[in-house]
Design a protein with these regions (language model features):
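C-terminal "capping" alpha-helix adjacent to the active site of nucleotide-linked donor transferases
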Residues: 192-211
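Short, surface-exposed helix/turn micro-motifs that flank interaction/cofactor sites
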Residues: 161-162, 220
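A charged, aromatic-enriched C-terminal amphipathic alpha-helix characteristic of glycosyltransferases
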Residues: 207-241
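CheY-like receiver
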Residues: 138, 199-203, 239
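Nucleotide-sugar donor-binding catalytic core of glycosyltransferases
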Residues: 1, 5-159, 166-180, 230, ...
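A short acidic/histidine/glycine-rich donor-binding loop in glycosyltransferase catalytic cores
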Residues: 184-191
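Residue-level signal for the nucleotide or nucleotide-sugar donor/cofactor binding architecture
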Residues: 155, 191-194, 227
């Protein structure tokens, strides 16, 4: 019953209706939402009247210090981790029945395609020792990594770059990952369903090209300047001020 603003963090907006989340707005008297999903995607699943702010959190700077030098990392394979589906017909038919909000294929279509390539090393979210705060240690083992989500950008995009990986990231009109501010060929390599094999093979066929290390370093610098928890905290403070000093 305290008269204080209620700020709510949100991740998967597309399950708002299937999980009955919208009524929570009135129940908990939520004033504002924040998260890393693009604003248009949030309002596609929540009423336009709900206030939302994009804040990119997840990279804790101290976990990305003392990086393994790029030259000493694995370069024969490209790392891809996290949830993924399968491409066989039976799996895809079963997946369709889940609906868009819970469809692995809808969320991870390109990631699923990437892991079928022979030079991509794939590990699921928990099938390794490098979980939670140790995830950066897994990333630091590899020169390159893949960050792909077909509906919106996820934390992997800025975790991978923070770890000094040359990051192949899915950036399309649909997933609106351009909101992160990365630039293709400068601090990341943009991929999509049409060009991913070509882009990934360009690295595998010439892994010692100095341009890769330069792009990786640029990606790390951009992330540590714009996409860390320190920056996110400042953004949250500014959001709080809007309500405290109104």
């Amino acid at each position: 019953n305290l008269d204080i603003p209620v700020i709510c963090r949100i991740n998967d907006a597309d399950d708002a209706k299937p999980k009955g989340k919208v009524p929570y707005h009135e129940k908990y008297k939520i004033d504002h939402y924040f998260g890393y999903i693009p604003e248009p995607f949030f309002h596609k699943h929540y009423p336009k009247s709900f206030k939302y702010k994009e804040i990119f959190y997840g990279v804790e700077p101290k976990l990305y210090e003392n990086l393994t030098p790029y030259s000493k990392r694995i370069k024969e394979r490209i790392l891809c981790s996290g949830a993924a589906g399968r491409t066989d017909l039976l799996y895809r038919l079963k997946d369709l029945r889940r609906g868009t909000a819970f469809s692995v294929w809808k969320h991870y279509k390109l990631r699923t395609k990437c892991i079928e390539l022979p030079y991509v090393y794939y590990t699921s979210t928990l099938q390794h020792e490098f979980v939670n705060d140790k995830y950066s240690s897994l990333l630091m083992k590899y020169c390159t990594s893949i960050a792909a989500h077909s509906l919106y950008p996820v934390i992997k995009y800025w975790e991978n770059t923070a770890a000094g990986c040359l990051t192949f990231m899915e950036v399309t009109e649909k997933n609106q990952a351009n909101i992160l501010g990365f630039e293709d060929g400068k601090n990341a390599i943009f991929i999509n369903e049409k060009n991913y094999e070509k882009k990934l093979s360009e690295f595998i066929s010439d892994p010692n090209n100095t341009k890769w290390a330069e792009i990786a370093e640029n990606g790390r610098n951009y992330t540590m300047t714009n996409l860390t928890n320190d920056i996110a905290s400042n953004s949250l403070v500014e959001l709080f001020k809007e309500y405290i000093f109104q």
